[in-house]
Design a protein with these regions (language model features):
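Membrane-interface helix/loop boundary segments of multi-pass membrane proteins
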Residues: 10, 127-152, 181-188
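Alpha-helical transmembrane segments in multi-pass membrane proteins
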Residues: 10-61, 81
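Hydrophobic alpha-helical transmembrane segments
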Residues: 14-22, 78-83, 114-118, 147-152, ...
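Juxtamembrane helix-loop-helix connectors linking adjacent transmembrane helices
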Residues: 35-44, 64-127, 142
Length: 212
């Protein structure tokens, strides 16, 4: 389906981009309104953010999922970025996650068990990262080029953090751009997922007082 154009009123539209934008807009809305599919929010998000985009690629676009970042990619680049970013963010978050706003927000939401917290955070973010740093990023890169794609996918990602502590929300545009850059450099959504999983888990563990 890549490159298929439809013309309406003399205006050309890329059909694949239309579908990607619809999915990238409607799925977060359905998630926001709390449509309960499994009884667990993280499992619901696997369906919304991972399974639906994946089925779209395979059944509708009829393209290899690797073309949308679902692969190991350039693992050397990915591993280096993952290690460096996680170390730097650990130092920053050690202090930021102790602020009253972060503690108030995450103490009420963090699971009691450390293992449960890490597990459910990983499940929750797996599909989330695939939608932005896989499905949307690589589709947009074809249509608009990688630079624009990296910026564009970061916008909805940042807006969906509204309601979280202000400091965290204000940094997410830059975080989303960084994640997109790493995904493009490594040609994989896996490394942004690993980084995001670490950042989210570490933040909750510090803010809720479960470690340090």
């Amino acid at each position: 389906m890549s490159g298929k154009i439809i013309t309406i009123g003399g205006v050309e539209f890329d059909l694949q981009i239309i579908i990607v934008i619809i999915i990238g807009t409607v799925i977060p809305m359905l998630d926001w309104y709390g449509h309960n599919l499994t009884g667990t929010k993280a499992y619901d998000r696997i369906i919304w953010y991972f399974i639906i985009p994946m089925l779209t690629i395979v059944l509708l676009f009829r393209e290899p999922v690797a073309d949308f970042g679902f692969q190991i990619g350039n693992w050397r680049v990915g591993v280096v970025w993952t290690a460096v970013v996680c170390v730097v963010m650990a130092v920053i978050l050690y202090f930021v996650a102790r602020t009253p706003a972060m503690q108030s927000y995450y103490q009420a939401r963090a699971p009691e068990s450390v293992i449960r917290l890490i597990y459910i955070t990983g499940v929750d973010l797996f599909g989330w990262e695939f939608l932005w740093r896989g499905f949307m990023l690589f589709a947009f890169a074809r249509a608009f080029g990688p630079g624009a794609a990296i910026l564009l996918q970061a916008v909805p990602f940042a807006l969906l953090h509204l309601g979280k502590p202000e400091t965290e929300t204000l940094t997410t545009l830059f975080g989303g751009v960084g994640f997109g850059f790493i995904a493009w450099q490594s040609q994989s959504f896996v490394y942004p997922f690993l980084i995001h999983w670490f950042i989210a888990s570490f933040t909750m563990l510090i803010a809720s007082g479960k470690i340090f």
